[in-house]
Amino acid sequence: SDIQWKFSVYRDNVSWYKKCFSIPMYRYDLRQYKKLLNVFYLPTDEMRAYLKEYPELLNRSAILMPGCAEYDVDAVQAISDLTAKKLEILYVGGIDRIYDLTVFFQAMQQMPDQVHAYVCCREKEWENAKSKYLPYMSEKISIIHESGQGLEPYYKKADICCAFAGEGDYMRMAMPIKVFEYLGHYIPIIATKDTAAGKFIEKENLGWSIEYNQEALKQCLHNILQNPALLQEKRESEISAYEANTWKARAKQVILDLK
């Protein structure tokens, strides 16, 4: 379940007449769930705090995070030789409303040319949001609009994936599905500390969970440039964590919960 509609990121960006219809319907859905569901799955424990007005539903709730799909990925890759190539970062997802890449763009502007990022988003979303990002654009950032198989060449290039895309109450509660896409490709992840993604990455040692500011990101990237063996260390943690986080593993949990 997702409850974006309870937050300002939804309320401040949706027309009043749409909210007049949609929010009562979202509440209606929640009231109906308690009549229809045996188990009510939430992606994080933090989401429970926003559903206190539905105690019957919370009594049958359980945590079920998104899962990893199966990708054609080599389980072991060589340690990146960053003297011979750039450190490549990949971000896939939204850039407006919920997810904010301003701090990421600002930090990238100040990084050496040895670091490069691909930012993948919907073309329409880029057109709507680009005025916010253009002051920080440089040759270190390439904007792409790909999905599905079109993304695979960029995953093959990437040394790091980015989940460093904002902070706040919604980010502390919501678990981005892209984190599991990154994990499924065995690519180390940089995320914002004290968000749902950051806590998961920190717990499983899948990358770096850092404060949401330019200096923290720059320090993290400089550290990786100086110690590229860290990439292989994080990748090995992802290989170990993969099986427990596939969609098959999630399905097995559902089977056990419904017995």
Question: What is the predicted function of each stretch?
Answer:
Residues Y212, Q226-L258:
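A charged, aromatic-enriched C-terminal amphipathic alpha-helix characteristic of glycosyltransferases
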Residues Y99, L151-Y154, C161-E181, I190-K199:
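Nucleotide-sugar-dependent
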Residues K203-E215, N223-A229:
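Conserved acidic donor-binding segment of nucleotide-sugar-dependent glycosyltransferases
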Residues V92, H116-A129:
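Glycosyltransferase donor-sugar binding loop
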Residues E46-M47, L64-A75, K124:
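Short beta-strand->alpha-helix junction loop in the catalytic core
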Residues A69, D81-Y99, F105-P112, Y118:
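Conserved donor-binding/catalytic core segment of Leloir-type glycosyltransferases
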Residues K19-F40:
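Membrane-proximal helix-turn-helix segments that form the acceptor-binding/catalytic region
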Residues E127-K157:
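Nucleotide-activated donor-binding/catalytic signature segment of Leloir-type glycosyltransferases, i.e.
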